[in-house]
Amino acid sequence: MRTIKLNIFCICLLTTLFSCKRNNNDEKKVFNINLDQNLTSLDPAFARNQNAIWMINQIFNGLVQVDKNLNTMPCIAKTWQVAEDGLSYTFNLRNDVFFQDDALFKNGKGRKVTAQDFAYSFYRLIDPKVASSGGWIFSDKVKDASSFVALNDSTFQIKLVKPFPAFINLLTAQYCSVVPKEVVEHYGKDFRNHPVGTGPFKFKYWKEDEVLVLLKNENYFEKDSAGKQMPFLDAVKATFINDKQSAFMNFLKKDLDFFYSVDGSYRDDILTKSGQMT
């Protein structure tokens, strides 16, 4: 139930982030949110903190994702097939997904995501040297690194040791985001604060316990139902005020665009008797 509630919140937050439009005067559109706890890491392999999951979800993508009804939908994988015996899952990847620009890539331009990237990313979750908190995703389900196979650049396969009907749903977890091997290996443990993914926003700045800034990924691959490029926002700015009253005052002053976990005692400060925002 806790996971379902978290997924629902993430979907609501994503909807808000993607649906905000630019002002008529073409000002930069920044989404301001407060997180009541600091992040533990921006590395998907350690996405165990609720707030980290929300922010990592802006920077990274996986094979699949959930829609507003919590149905598993395509993301970087455009289609997939499950073997009749339930022991292998084969994913066909999009060919228009690129990692965000980084100096470690040729000419500083993000390269195309391949099946090899997923094989590397998923093995990280079970690699004892990494000690990922997401190892449970594949625990007792895969054998070792040989379970993650890049059949070619655009076809990725996972081999299970036994059938697990809900397996595809597990892959929507933020732990299962794709990361670039060369960047992770270059930064090592510092990848936690130098993340490079494929998501709608790219990392800009993080001062722990104070502020996190993400900028629009101009090369993001997803579009809305009308074919318009997402995201519509130019940036996301997260502050880390752990005192709820102080954070709520910032919301009332319109310094924040989104506020969650509203205490019932604040209801009259933000809602009229008819239920409208004051």
Feature names for model-found ranges:
Residues 16-19:
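C-terminal motif of bacterial Sec signal peptides marking the signal peptidase cleavage site
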Residues 21-23:
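Bacterial signal peptide processing site
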Residues 29-40, 78, 88-92, 118-121, ...:
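Short, well-ordered beta-strand elements
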Residues 34-84, 123, 130, 196:
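N-terminal lobe/hinge region of extracytoplasmic solute-binding protein
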Residues 78-130, 247-250:
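Aromatic- and charge-enriched surface segment that lines or borders ligand/interaction sites
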Residues 81, 117, 130-181, 207:
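Surface-exposed binding/hinge segments that line
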Residues 100, 159-177, 192-246, 267-278:
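Aromatic-rich, solvent-exposed beta-strand/loop patch
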Residues 118, 154-156, 247, 252-261:
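Alpha-to-beta junction loops
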